[in-house]
């Protein structure tokens, strides 16, 4: 500090005093953060350069790595896995207490042995995914990659078969994954009812669609059929480009020609007999016509009629009216009656020319936000829009190459950086490879979940809101880059905004 003494002891003047003050002020400003850290401790954790976690590709596993990264980018799915984990731990505690005569002290031996052998677990795939995905969404200060084999081994154990080493499809893998998760959840519900009624979270991917026909002439509806869905399947049109919203709208309707509408046929018979004043109708036929009047106002257009009524309608031919010739156009509608919390859209790009399959290069224009409608089908046959639901884009899986080969990669939206730790010692760890320390050695890394977490939004996330992940290769990406993947977008992952 001699330089400060020299300055202060030199002949004084107004200018020198001012200069001295400025120098001291600047020095204090520079060292103040260090002094604060020494006295009060570091109140902020420095982020600096950071990255996320990649997945190791064993050879042709890009369909697995991209699918898992896509799911990891959805906060609601992560929350669902955590809630299932809590249910499993509560069940385990309950069983342990019952076995020990309600002793509140829980021995971890059973827990660890069960988790080591996924086949003995109530929900092995849930546990494997929880372990892996919590590692994937963690933030690292150096390049880090882990193996997806914890999930692969669990699936192979469940299905008792090996996953093919050949090129596979990301959509098919994701569908199998979701179906298996739902089956595990159903078993967990049944099992928990036997022990204690626990609050099992709703499966966030579950939606429901209804298919039915609408006659363009009589406006009658067919009997609707309902289907549980996990992924929205869309056929990409064979054209240069199209908006996702238009594909969704077109997917809900299809025109069918030459359809034999039962209601139109019955009404034609009744009108014709009234015009003829029921000439030459026998008493039995009059009774039959009375029965038809009930069907004409209440029945669906595809009603399964009693045999004798069906035969009368089919064979009716009087004067210039032959019922078999009455045909018209109907609209085949496929509407959503229950929208999921997490919407996965599969853009099917397969085209068949009668001989071979090829890849459809149509540019599908999609946005970071979409709004979908949910409908209600009343018993009266009316269709009403129930509500509109907004979704935000969280992940995109793209595919480059041909129909039969190529490469999958994922864009995953960044989440907030979280600080803080939570004990995760009861859960299995995914093998990790630290590329800067040892590229050839796998080691176990303990995942640090977040208890009393502090959240911080990184400035760079505003400019580069997405991770671009190709197996172990990771870099940041802008929103415009993601939205420009119109030619290669294969699966879109949206999360519900308003619940």
Curated annotation (Swiss-Prot):
Against Gene3D superfamilies, the record matches this protein to: Cysteine proteinases
GO MF, one annotated term: cysteine-type deubiquitinase activity
Could you say which EC number(s) this protein's record lists?
3.4.19.12
> What InterPro entries is this protein classified in?
Papain-like_cys_pep_sf, Peptidase_C19, Peptidase_C19_UCH, USP_CS, USP_dom
Q: Where is the active site?
A: 62, 407
| Assigned GO CC terms | mitochondrial outer membrane; mitochondrion
| Catalyzed reactions | Thiol-dependent hydrolysis of ester, thioester, amide, peptide and isopeptide bonds formed by the C-terminal Gly of ubiquitin (a 76-residue protein attached to proteins as an intracellular targeting signal)
Transmembrane region positions?
Answer: none
All copies of domain USP, residue ranges: 53-497
Give UniProt keywords alphabetically. Answer: Hydrolase, Protease, Thiol protease, Ubl conjugation pathway
- Pfam families recorded: UCH
A Gene Ontology biological process noted in the UniProt record is: proteolysis
The kind of enzyme this is, by top-level EC class, is hydrolase
What's the family?
A: Belongs to the peptidase C19 family.
Further comment: Present with 450 molecules/cell in log phase SD medium.
Write the protein's name. Answer: Ubiquitin carboxyl-terminal hydrolase 16
Give the organism the record lists.
Answer: Saccharomyces cerevisiae (strain ATCC 204508 / S288c) (Baker's yeast)
Gene from which this protein is expressed: UBP16
